[in-house]
């Protein structure tokens, strides 16, 4: 299912956040939770898996449902949701899926003979006496497991540390035996939470949730969501269970840290890094539909420097492609591929979006599964004067016309076109007015070369934007 290498890397109607990427054989598999479009809570759908060839991150294949809420232990009434999982290949060559339910402090495990087959419940992580991890007096909440198998040893990381919640120490670490369930050793928190981070290198970026672990050479990288929630950070150590030192921010889903103000609407973040065909990437997610519960997977190339540091990367449209997108060769540039969406003027209220005054990415139609014959179209709604829609990066060659597909009631409407967020417009494109989607083409030469492009709305009223074309 090719998408020209644009973010989000899965189809616009798919909502798989918390992505843990793992290369098994010649494919990279994504294991995440599964949001429901227009849902009322996190992770309401069953676990699904998508995969792509390691040499083509534009060609994602739906592998199917791999585990359902109905199959999960401790969920007899089906009321609980499957929260963020992780998968590891065990010493026996089978694949083990570690997960937690939203209201149960336990890490459960399901197993499968293949990376993306039907997983079956295997058991709960437990102490040697059989007591479930998380059930002993004094145990902290088990949440967001991350796993790494080395030989016959599996390292399990877990934890949930809201900054104001008492009794939470940080990211928890456990060594498991070769049965993949029994705790052989427990360790003090490897990364402190906000209540214990004062005076450490983690202060201001303490552990919140989203444990993930990778080994790069001889160095262990612990990836996590910080107390700020919208950034993924990393810590490094030469040991999997102690000595982690704060490294920095990998990615922020609003580009904070790289920009003084948010370039997208912030929300929680979860993901990890993976080496794919010799190149390293960070997987993370963004929020859509003006909701915490409609999250989509994103990916960017990263660079691990010789000293082990990983500079923060910006969120882009072209991340999966690993290079700027060819502007003219794209049939069209969908609006949902915008990596920047923000306002420079006070918001207005759009009747189409009820009382929400902010622009956001949404879709026409209900939540769908890949098997559905018809798929909803995604677009940006609630654009008001001063709203900026940005795409990074495109390779422009011989562009003399720009078209936009819009609908809405906007008078004297259109978009100033900019090549830098704070630069001067290189021209203006007109937008059609009406309740039906309509293309409007304007003659506008864009200089040859690699650039971002921004559409800043002007006029009076509101618009929705579905796509742009470059001719």
Features from the language model and the residues they span:
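Carbohydrate-active catalytic/glycan-binding domains of CAZyme proteins
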Residues: 1-471
């Amino acid at each position: 299912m090719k998408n020209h290498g644009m973010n989000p890397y899965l189809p616009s109607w798919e909502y798989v956040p918390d992505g843990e990427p793992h290369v098994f054989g010649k494919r990279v598999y994504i294991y995440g939770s599964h949001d429901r479009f227009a849902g009322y809570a996190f992770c309401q759908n069953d676990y699904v898996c998508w995969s792509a060839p390691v040499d083509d991150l534009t060609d994602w294949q739906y592998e199917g449902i791999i585990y359902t809420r109905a199959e999960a232990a401790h969920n007899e009434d089906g009321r609980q949701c499957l929260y963020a999982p992780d998968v590891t290949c065990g010493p026996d060559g089978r694949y083990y899926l570690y997960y937690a339910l939203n209201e149960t402090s336990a890490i459960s495990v399901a197993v499968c003979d293949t990376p993306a087959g039907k997983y079956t419940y295997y058991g709960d992580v437990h102490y040697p006496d059989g007591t479930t991890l998380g059930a002993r007096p004094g145990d902290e909440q088990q949440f967001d497991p991350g796993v790494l198998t080395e030989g016959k040893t599996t390292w399990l990381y877990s934890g949930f540390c809201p900054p104001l919640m008492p009794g939470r120490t940080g990211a928890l670490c456990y060594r498991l035996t070769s049965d993949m369930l029994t705790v052989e050793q427990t360790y003090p928190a490897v990364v402190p939470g906000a209540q214990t981070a004062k005076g450490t290198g983690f202060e201001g970026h303490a552990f919140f949730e989203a444990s993930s672990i990778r080994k790069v050479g001889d160095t262990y990288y612990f990836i996590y969501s910080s107390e700020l929630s919208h950034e993924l950070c990393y810590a490094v150590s030469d040991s999997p269970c102690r000595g982690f030192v704060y490294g920095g921010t990998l990615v922020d889903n609003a580009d904070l840290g790289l920009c003084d103000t948010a370039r997208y609407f912030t929300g929680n973040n979860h993901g990890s890094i993976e080496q794919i065909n010799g190149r390293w990437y960070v997987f993370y997610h963004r929020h859509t539909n003006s909701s915490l519960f409609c999250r989509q997977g994103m990916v960017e190339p990263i660079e691990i420097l010789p000293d082990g540091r990983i500079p923060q990367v910006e969120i882009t449209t072209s991340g999966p492609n690993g290079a700027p997108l060819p502007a003219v060769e794209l049939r069209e540039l969908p609006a949902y591929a915008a990596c920047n969406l923000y306002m420079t003027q006070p918001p207005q209220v759009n009747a189409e979006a009820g009382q929400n005054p902010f622009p956001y990415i949404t879709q026409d139609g209900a939540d769908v599964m890949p098997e559905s014959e018809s798929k909803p179209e995604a677009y940006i709604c609630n654009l008001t004067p001063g709203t900026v829609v940005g795409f990074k990066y495109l390779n422009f060659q011989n562009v003399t016309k720009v078209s936009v597909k819009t609908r809405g009631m906007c008078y004297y409407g259109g978009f100033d076109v900019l090549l830098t967020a704070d630069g001067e417009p290189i021209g203006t494109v007109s937008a059609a007015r009406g309740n039906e989607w309509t293309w409007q083409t304007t003659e506008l030469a864009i200089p040859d070369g690699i650039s971002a492009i921004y559409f800043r709305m002007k006029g009076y009223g509101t618009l929705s934007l579905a796509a742009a074309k470059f001719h």
